[in-house]
Each structure stands twice: as C-alpha cells, then as structure tokens.
C-alpha cells in the first residue's frame, strides 16, 4: 500500500519495473527507477530515450536459436561499451581535419558511441527473452518472436517518459535522494 502523499517515488531495486509499471503515473511527484545491474539500467534508458533505434536493433526477423543465444550471452558477459578514447579521437580529428571533414568524422564517432548502448540493450533484452526463466544463463528452447513485444516497448517508453533512470548502488541512491517527503520502494 502506498502512502497518501509523497513528492518522489523511488524504486531502489527496480528489477523488471513491475511496481513502477503497475502504478499509474502521477504528475504530482517525481519518479525514479534504479537498478545496480548496468545492463538493466541501460535497457530501461534505451527503451525510454532511444526507442526507435532500440526496436531497429532488435530486428524484424529474429532467429531465436541456441547459437544466437550463445552469441548474445557472450556479447553481454564480455563486451562493455568502450568510449575511453572518444574524446582523444575527437581532439585528433579536430586538429588534423578541415572543418567539413571534422564534422562528418565527429558525427560518425558520436553515433558509434551511442549505438553501442542500443546494441547492448537489444542484446540484453533478447538474452532475457530467449533464456530459460529469464535467467540469462541457459537457452529456453521455446519459440519467441521479439516482434510481438514492439507495442509493449512503445508503451513502456511512454510510461518512462517522465521517469529518471539511475544505475547506482542502493546506499548511494538513498544518500542522494533521501528527503522526508520521499517514498522508497
């Protein structure tokens, strides 16, 4: 049961967001979704802010095979987005290229940095859906057409429109947001 009045609703351990999605949006309060799992927080971020790119990355002809599951699981387990050298690459491009060429290279570098998050989100979504019990460790051996989720993803994007997505340890999150008028769930 929710309190009668609060200024901010904060899901400390957001997980699948069942409570957030189960409650009606409230214009009177700020909503914060948090999960320590960076893949899950990234998935929610991409569903909220990059919906079209996320759906495009999911693809329209999914394979849903054990081989695809293994490739996706390996991608999620081993590959993190690497933007460590983005600033350095942009500085070098600006220094050595003429302005029109620099702008084109800058656009490509920034798009590639952003797309990594979308690719990771799409891979994680498929890993969840294709795995046994959504555990992300073993193939579920059941047919699943990712296209059946497209409408739900659009609905989730609209529901998350005014929600802050965080990826913090619960203690850091509570320290940051703790106020008398907040409701932590």
Labelled PLM ranges:
Residues 1-4, 176-177:
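Glycine-rich helix-loop-beta junction characteristic of Rossmann-like nucleotide cofactor-binding loops
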Residues 6, 30, 182-184:
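The start of beta-strands in P-loop NTPase/AAA+ ATPase cores
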Residues 6-13, 32:
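Conserved class I S-adenosyl-L-methionine
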Residues 12-14, 147-148:
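Short, motif-level signal for alpha-helix interfacial/capping segments enriched in acidic residues
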Residues 16-28:
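Conserved SAM-binding loop of SAM-dependent methyltransferases across substrates and taxa
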Residues 17-20, 41, 173-175:
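Short, well-ordered alpha-helical microsegments
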Residues 26-167, 171:
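Class I S-adenosyl-L-methionine-dependent methyltransferase module
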Residues 164-185:
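Active-site segment flanking the S-adenosylmethionine/decSAM binding pocket
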């Amino acid at each position: 049961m929710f309190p009668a009045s609060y200024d901010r609703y904060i899901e400390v351990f957001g997980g699948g967001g069942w409570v957030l999605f189960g409650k009606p949006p409230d214009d009177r309060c700020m909503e914060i979704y948090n999960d320590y799992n960076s893949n899950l927080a990234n998935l929610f971020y991409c569903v909220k802010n990059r919906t079209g790119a996320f759906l495009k990355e999911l693809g329209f002809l999914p394979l849903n095979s054990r081989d695809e599951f293994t490739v996706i699981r390996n991608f999620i387990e081993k590959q993190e987005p690497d933007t460590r050298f983005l600033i350095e690459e942009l500085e070098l491009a600006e220094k050595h290229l003429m302005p029109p060429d620099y702008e084109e290279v800058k656009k490509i570098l920034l798009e590639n940095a952003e797309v990594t998050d979308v690719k990771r989100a799409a891979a994680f979504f498929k890993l969840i859906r294709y795995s046994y019990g959504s555990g992300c460790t073993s193939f579920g051996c059941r047919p699943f057409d990712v296209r059946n989720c497209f409408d739900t993803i659009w609905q989730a994007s609209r529901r998350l429109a005014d929600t802050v997505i965080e990826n913090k340890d619960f203690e850091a999150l509570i320290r940051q947001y703790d106020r008398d008028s907040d409701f932590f769930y």
